[in-house]
């Protein structure tokens, strides 16, 4: 039977499969911020794992990598009192949605995110959680010897407190007492989906990974919606251009971020004036610097401290009708034993029941 005849037979017997395969080939499904289709994901993950195993055979186990979370509980009465005091005065001069109370809602994401690190990244030396004088209710039942709460006052100059601006908080991560030179920055809505080795983030020679996206900052601006993250990234590019011959147009994948304390210190020495200029912004504005998620990773790259690496991850906005489809897809992959993605990142502003179901899919 010729190839054409086989296709015709498939069309007659299984038209739904025929059109599914035809459309998948013509319009490959993409779940990530990288130029790879869904059919390529498992092979890429397997290739990364094999390379990491070769490196592991020739190096000692790394024991000096920390994890840092930032977290806020918007339902805390003490925090709400501070928010109510400052939000009305800053609403007009802050960036789009910067004072929206939904940005600070807690759906217990941190519980699952921290436990995922403990389960799938047991080599992590210590976990630091930065809060505004808050404590997760579940912390006493968790491995406290490996987790330390860091209050904003411990790392941020008092003249800038209170702050509700994540960009400001992220500018002081290097001030965490006893923080390792190499650390990984997490938001609390990032969930590890399977075991990850230290080499995915840092090589034994100290070189960090930088997870670049195929997205374009220029295209984002041309769409007309200027977010504080976009503005802060563009500001960071202008600062980098003072020292390096760059043509940066790629944001990083919306993921965990390997960082170096020494590169934070370098940024503060070089750009102190610009940094001090945005720290008074109590809510995010279009004049901020995107420190942890852009400036420092790119600075590490141009200083020869980081190299590009692939990170297969899914970004969920569970307000989207497509979210349930993605959830079922990952659950099916887990059930049939297929390689899972590195992690999933979600926007969690809907019913808590759905949130919990989705998170459990990845962790347990």
Swiss-Prot record:
Sections of the chain in a coiled coil: none
GO MF terms held by the record: transferase activity, transferring phosphorus-containing groups
Chain segments annotated as transmembrane: none
Domain of life (superkingdom): Bacteria
Note, other: Stealth proteins are part of a protein family that is conserved from bacteria to higher eukaryotes. Family members were first identified in microbes as proteins that help pathogens to elude the host innate immune system. Microbial stealth proteins are involved in the biosynthesis of exopolysaccharides. Stealth proteins are predicted to function as hexose-1-phosphoryltransferases.
Similarity field: Belongs to the stealth family.
The protein, known as: Capsular polysaccharide phosphotransferase cps1A
Native species: Actinobacillus pleuropneumoniae
Gene: cps1A
